[in-house]
Amino acid sequence: MSLVLLSLAALCRSAVPREPTVQCGSETGPSPEWMLQHDLIPGDLRDLRVEPVTTSVATGDYSILMNVSWVLRADASIRLLKATKICVTGKSNFQSYSCVRCNYTEAFQTQTRPSGGKWTFSYIGFPVELNTVYFIGAHNIPNANMNEDGPSMSVNFTSPGCLDHIMKYKKKCVKAGSLWDPNITACKKNEETVEVNFTTTPLGNRYMALIQHSTIIGFSQVFEPHQKKQTRASVVIPVTGDSEGATVQLTPYFPTCGSDCIRHKGTVVLCPQTGVPFPLDNNKSKPGGWLPLLLLSLLVATWVLVAGIYLMWRHERIKKTSFSTTTLLPPIKVLVVYPSEICFHHTICYFTEFLQNHCRSEVILEKWQKKKIAEMGPVQWLATQKKAADKVVFLLSNDVNSVCDGTCGKSEGSPSENSQDLFPLAFNLFCSDLRSQIHLHKYVVVYFREIDTKDDYNALSVCPKYHLMKDATAFCAELLHVKQQVSAGKRSQACHDGCCSL
C-alpha cells in the first residue's frame, strides 16, 4: 500500500511543471543570439530596480554589492524568453563596465507564477564603490535583429559616501574614520578660552579643533602619541569672540585620506561650576554667636557694593571716551573670485583662512555654494552675492599649474576639477555694471606674485592692488574700515576712467 502511495506522489510531482530560476554568469561581448535572425522576440521588462546590500561586514572591501531585481512582463511573448542580460557602467574617477547573462533554467509555461504574482528575479554580484554614478541597463534574450530597435530598460543609481549606514563599513571608509566616534565635549571656561575634549583613534595622531560662530573664532592643532587603543585628549583653545553655542569641528589627519577625512562636530556649552563646601561654624550653636558674623558680613557686602559701583562708573567713563576705538564692527562679507588655473587647496584655502583669521571677514566662495549656483544660475548667483558683499576681491596669481597638479593630484580643489570658471563671467558682469564712480570702492585686486594684466582684463591696471603678504596690513585695514567709509560717505578714488570689476 505504501509503495502505491509513493508512486502516486512521484507521478503528481512530475505532472507539476518546475518554476524557472536563473543561473547568472559573466558575458562581456555580444550575445550569440544577436548574430541570428528571429521572427519573434520577447517583450521588454516590466520593472528594474537597484539597491546596495552588504553580504558580510568582515569580508573586505567588496562586501557591499549591488542587488539588481527585475520583473517580467505578463504577456504571451514570455514563452520565447531564454535569458536576461544586465550591464552596469560606473562613472567616477575612472569608468567601469561589466555585464552578466542570467539564463532561465526552464521555459515559461505561464505568464504569471502558478502561485500568483508576476515573475520576479534578482542578481547580487556587482561591487559598489563610493560616490559613483551607475547606469544599469537590461534587455531580454533573444534580442532584436541587427539594425532594429530592441526593447530594453535602464535605471540610474548613485552610490552614497562613507556617511551612509551601509557604505561606512567599506575598508576605505573605515580607514577614513567612518566607525570612529570622538565623543566631542566642549565648554566655555571664560571669555577668552574654550576647553575641548575628545576620544582619539589609532588611525592617526594629528587633529585640528576649530571653533566657529558664523566665522572662525579660534583653532588649535592637536598632536597625540600614536597608540593602539583609544585615549581621551584635551586642549584649551583661545577664542576671539563669544563662544557659547558655537560649533566645534574636529578634523583628523589620517594617512589614507589626508585632510579629506570624515569630520565631526560638537557644540560649546558653559563649563560646570565646581562648588566649594562652606565649613560649618561652631559659633552658630552658641547663643549670640551669630551677631558678630552678621555685622561683619554686612560690612563686607557694603564695601563690595561700593567698590562695584565705582568700577562700573569708571568702566562706563572709559568706554565713552574710547568708544570709537573699542567698538567692533560686524564681520565684513567678502566675495572672492579667482581664475580656474589657481590651485584651490594651496592658494584659495590659505587666502580664505587669512581673511577669516586676520581680517575678520566672512568669505563667499563659489566652491562652497555649488548647489545654490545650480539652483539660481551663475549670473543670478553672482548678482546676488555682489549685492550682499561689502567687498569683491579678484584673486590673481601666476602660479604654474603643474606645481599644483603635482602636489594635489586629482584631489578636490585641484584646477582640473573646476567644471565652471566664473572669473570671465564675473569680470564681464561687474565691468558692465561698475562704470559709475559710486561703486568703485567695492572692488579690489589681490595677488601673491608679480603679475601682468592680460589684454582681456586690461581694465584691472587702474584698480587698487595689494601684494600679499607684502601689503597685508594695508589690505586688512581697508577691509576692516569698509563699513565706516560707506557710512561716512567716503568713496575710494583709486580707480579712474576704468571698470574696476576686479
From Swiss-Prot:
GO molecular function, one term: interleukin-17 receptor activity
Membrane topology, Cytoplasmic segments: 314-502
Glycosylation, residue list: N67, N103, N156, N183, N197, N283
Domain SEFIR: 331-477
Entry annotated with the keyword Translocase: no
Keywords from the UniProt entry: Cell membrane, Glycoprotein, Membrane, Receptor, Secreted, Signal, Transmembrane, Transmembrane helix
Signal peptide from the UniProt entry: 1-17
Keyword Transmembrane helix part of the UniProt annotation: yes
One GO CC annotation: extracellular region
TM segment ranges: 293-313
Tissue: Expressed in several endocrine tissues, mostly in fetal and adult liver, kidney, pancreas, testis, colon, brain and small intestine; not detected in peripheral blood leukocytes, lymphoid organs, and most cell lines.
Gene3D superfamilies named in the record: 3.40.50.11530, Interleukin-17 receptor A/B, fibronectin-III-like domain 1 (2.60.40.2160), Interleukin-17 receptor A/B, fibronectin-III-like domain 2 (2.60.40.2150)
Chain's role: Receptor for the pro-inflammatory cytokines IL17B and IL17E. May play a role in controlling the growth and/or differentiation of hematopoietic cells.
Annotated PANTHER family: INTERLEUKIN-17 RECEPTOR, INTERLEUKIN-17 RECEPTOR B
Subunit annotation: Interacts with DAZAP2. Interacts with TRAF3IP2.
Protein name as catalogued: Interleukin-17 receptor B
